Regions:
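Cell-envelope/extracellular polymer assembly enzymes that use nucleotide-activated donors
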Residues: 2-4, 33, 187
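Catalytic donor-sugar/metal-binding loop of nucleotide-sugar-dependent glycosyltransferases
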Residues: 153, 177-180, 189-206
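A conserved acidic beta->alpha catalytic loop
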Residues: 38-47, 93
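Short, well-formed alpha-helical segments that are part of the catalytic scaffolds
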Residues: 12-27
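Short beta-strand/loop segment that forms part of the nucleotide-sugar
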Residues: 30-41, 62-64
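Acceptor/aglycone-binding surface of glycosyltransferases and processive sugar-polymer synthases
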Residues: 62-80, 85, 97-182, 208-220
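Acidic helix N-cap motif at the loop->helix transition within catalytic regions
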Residues: 14-18, 43-52
């Protein structure tokens, strides 16, 4: 089974190598592809990834010059992915890499198109999420629940940046996602109009490995 992991980056040079060191052992279980989608970072993230890719053939760099934005980076990475399954996660270390296997196994073993890692699942752990950001996420999730198809009413984290999906059935929807919209996962659910079979798994959300969050002033 081929698994593509999409990592959008912007100035994550201090975080990307520690994260990759935890993801690369997945090669023992999957035909692994890791796509780092970099928005022309000023801190040398792309150059560092390019050097790492010389030692790890499963690693690919997509360097975006003149294009920017988290949602568009996710979309570009997913459309370029070659796996049967794909997983999107943050590149700053706040998403626990151990959750990758949990999400992918749930996707494989269940009859699902999409598996969401939820920060607000009853078994989730949140460490390092600012009070402002947690409050904003709670508000945004409440609003999202009322705006999406009722089939998704049982989900707890529509704003999650951690999710796994089956590429082939979801590909037409990915192409239709508005990258200028709210959040990528939310927009994907919106364009699906209730057609996706979705499950959630608990997510451990932890402090950044290095640097400061770019989202503390946002509602994510």
């Amino acid at each position: 089974m081929r698994l593509s992991i999409v990592l959008p980056t912007y100035n994550e040079r201090g975080n990307i190598e520690p994260l990759l060191s935890q993801l690369l052992p997945l090669q023992e279980q999957f035909d692994l592809e890791i796509l780092v989608v970099d928005d022309d970072s000023a801190d040398g993230t792309a150059e560092h990834v390019r050097q790492l890719a010389q030692r790890h053939p499963c690693l690919r760099l997509i360097r975006r010059v003149g294009r920017s934005g988290l949602a568009s980076a996710i979309k570009e990475g997913l459309l370029d992915a070659t796996g049967d399954l794909a997983l999107v996660m943050d590149s700053d270390g706040q998403h626990e890499p151990a959750g990758v296997l949990r999400a992918v196994q749930t996707l494989q073993q269940g009859d699902f198109d999409l598996v969401v890692g939820s920060r607000f699942h009853q078994e989730a752990e949140i460490r390092g999420l600012s009070g402002r950001r947690e409050q904003g996420s709670t508000w945004a999730n409440g609003a999202a629940r009322f705006s999406l198809h009722r089939r998704y009413a049982g989900l707890t984290d529509y704003m999650s940046g951690f999710f796994a999906l089956r590429l082939e059935p979801v590909l037409p929807l990915l192409r239709a996602v508005d990258v200028n919209g709210f959040k990528f996962l939310y927009e994907l659910l919106a364009v699906s109009h209730g057609r996706l079979r979705v499950a959630e798994v608990p997510l451990t959300f932890q402090p950044r490995l290095s640097g400061t969050s770019k989202l503390d002033l946002a509602i994510f």
